Amino acid sequence: MTAWRDTLGRIGVRAMPGAGGFWRWWQQSLLAWLPQRWQWQLGLSQSRLLLQLDGEALQLLRQRDQTSDTVASLPWPVQPQEVNALLPTALEGLPQHWLLPASHALRRPLRLPAAAAARLQDVARFEIDRQTPFTADQVYFDARVLDVREDGQLDAELVVVPRRMIDGPAGVPEAWSNALSGIDVADARGAPLGVNLLPPARRLRRSDPMQRWNLLLAVAALVLLAVAGWLLLDNRRQAADDLRAQVQANAGRARQVAAERQQLLELVEGAAFFQEQRATRPTSVEIWDELSRRLPSGTYLEKFSVEGGQLQLIGLSKEASSLVRRLEGSPLWHTPSLTGVLQSDAGRNVDRFTITAELAGPDAKEAADAAQR
């Protein structure tokens, strides 16, 4: 039995007590869909090559599951190299097992708990002293599970062959001792029991048909893992780049909004400042009203200007020399004064004047408003 099928068998015994028949039926049903050659190449077949001495001839049998077909009959003696040279290509990789006659073996039935399936060889070694007249060092042995009872116990069988029956002249020839993957025993009808009496250390390890598949699967898994990791890393890198670009775009818009907000704030503050400045200065209407009350008759203005908190009056008056005195004491301005000299206009009997004054601050404006009220 191959490693895969051994593993599946152990799982079937331990994981599903009482369902061994169903497990075997399910396996066989699945395998029936695959050609025999594929079953062997995938490591799912029980195919092996049996070698059995029959008088003066060596019978070569190919066992597949429970059936055996004669491959060749070679005159004895024959060397392993000669047999391998005669084998077809499809049979070269099959494990070779020597088949002993039923008379060489001693078989004893065993009833074991289900937990014993995991350590069947150790349990069988312990049972040798109890079930046979030999010790474990005097025999080659193996055990096989026959059935799983409804109560979970195992029906097993212990198979032992004295060492002299294998190592002696009537056993396996010395030339074949290092060329075998196992030693099996035939039952009363000549069918192999399916045991392997050869110790694991002496079994020939042929190339595992699944080794190449396992290697390819491992390489494929590594490649897929590397590709998945690279794709994940590239995806995360792309996501990071997109996030960085989005942050930069948002930062640019945020800076633009902040700049526009600052500009708007400055405009609002500037407008508020100018509004405040205008509120603290007398208006043109108020200045005109004040001038109309203070300027005497016969006075004409050619220019009226308010710039930077300074009032400038240019005009003609018959009483130009008294204008400064008349303008003094107003709550809307202070320190009125003539700029330059008076220029006489003899034809009209008036003098040209230029007067400047500083507009008053908010306190004076409030006083003027109160006086008007």
UniProtKB/Swiss-Prot annotation:
Example GO BP: protein transport
Segments on the Cytoplasmic face: 1-214
Compartments (UniProt record): Cell inner membrane
Keywords: Cell inner membrane, Cell membrane, Membrane, Protein transport, Transmembrane, Transmembrane helix, Transport
Periplasmic side, ranges: 234-373
Xref: Gene3D superfamilies: 3.30.1490.300
Transmembrane regions listed in the UniProt entry: 215-233
One cellular component term from this protein's GO annotations in UniProt: plasma membrane
SUPFAM superfamilies xref list: Actin-like ATPase domain
Keyword Ribosomal protein among record annotations: no
Membrane topology: Single-pass membrane protein
Record note on quaternary structure: Type II secretion system is composed of four main components: the outer membrane complex, the inner membrane complex, the cytoplasmic secretion ATPase and the periplasm-spanning pseudopilus. Forms homodimers. Interacts with XpsM/GspM. Interacts with XpsE/GspE and XpsF/GspF.
Function field: Inner membrane component of the type II secretion system required for the energy-dependent secretion of extracellular factors such as proteases and toxins from the periplasm. Plays a role in the complex assembly and recruits XpsM resulting in a stable complex in the inner membrane. Provides thus a link between the energy-providing XpsE protein in the cytoplasm and the rest of the T2SS machinery.
Family: Belongs to the GSP L family.
Protein name, as recorded: Type II secretion system protein L
Organism of provenance: Xanthomonas campestris pv. campestris (strain ATCC 33913 / DSM 3586 / NCPPB 528 / LMG 568 / P 25)
